[in-house]
């Protein structure tokens, strides 16, 4: 998920860690602008009844907008107190893309800038309100882990090919389950599979 994180890959081994806990409240965080992610989020909403909190990406790109960060954090707090989880994303995920190529320097700069805002939102939420994370996008994963004072991810297995899962290996939330994926990866049900996996539904 990025050079700033230490990834300990134990997939295929028998790591000396506690049994993976079943998450009860899951926070899905995506900084992706990919149409694949938009379809996956809509599917997750429809099947699981989750609600999403959307950040105003245009505003956050041009001004600090601390009230926008506070608004999102407050709404997420309300949802996590009442429901099984919530989704944090940018409004721009659901309308036409900017047209930047994946390797465009401007696109990468925008992506990192917006991902940092996601970390700011999580930094204002009581971390006891959730016990599982699904992170979409490499910049998102780095920003979220930084905000949670986590420097290591312990990868244990894959939900499906290309969707690694594991635990936060250090920091205040050490031991909580996490699933990561790239924004463009997967089919419509990929996030739904991740949701069921992290909650251990059907096991």
In which residue ranges do the predicted regions lie?
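Redox- and metal-dependent alpha/beta enzyme cores, enriched for Fe-S-associated oxidoreductases
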Residues: 17-114
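Fold-independent oxyanion-binding glycine-rich loops
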Residues: 3, 30-33, 90-92, 136-138, ...
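Solvent-exposed alpha-helices and their adjacent loops that cap or buttress functional pockets
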Residues: 17-22, 79-81, 125-127, 158, ...
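Conserved, well-ordered active-site substructure
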Residues: 130, 135-190
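Extended hydrophobic packing segments that form well-structured cores
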Residues: 189-203
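A glycine- and small-aliphatic-rich helix-loop capping segment at beta-alpha/alpha-beta transitions
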Residues: 8-10, 148-158, 196-200
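Catalytic cores of soluble, metal-dependent hydrolases
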Residues: 73-77, 99-155
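Short, small-residue-biased leader/transition segments that mark boundaries at the very start
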Residues: 1-7
């Amino acid at each position: 998920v990025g050079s700033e994180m230490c990834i300990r890959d134990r997939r295929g081994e028998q790591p000396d860690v506690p049994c993976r806990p079943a998450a009860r409240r899951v926070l899905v965080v995506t900084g992706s602008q990919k149409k694949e992610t938009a379809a996956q989020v809509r599917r997750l909403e429809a099947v699981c009844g989750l609600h999403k909190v959307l950040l105003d990406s245009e505003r956050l790109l041009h001004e600090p907008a601390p009230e926008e960060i506070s608004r999102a954090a407050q709404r997420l707090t309300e949802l996590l107190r009442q429901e099984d989880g919530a989704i944090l994303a940018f409004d721009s995920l659901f309308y036409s893309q900017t047209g930047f190529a994946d390797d465009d320097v401007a696109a990468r700069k925008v992506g990192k800038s917006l991902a940092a805002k996601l970390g700011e939102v999580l930094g204002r939420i009581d971390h006891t309100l959730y016990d599982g994370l699904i992170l979409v996008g490499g910049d998102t994963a780095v920003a979220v882990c930084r905000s949670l004072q986590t420097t290591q991810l312990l990868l244990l297995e894959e939900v499906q090919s290309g969707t690694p899962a594991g635990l936060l290996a250090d920091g205040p939330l050490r031991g909580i389950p996490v699933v990561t994926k790239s924004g463009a990866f997967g089919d419509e049900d990929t996030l739904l599979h991740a949701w069921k996996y992290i909650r251990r539904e059907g096991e």
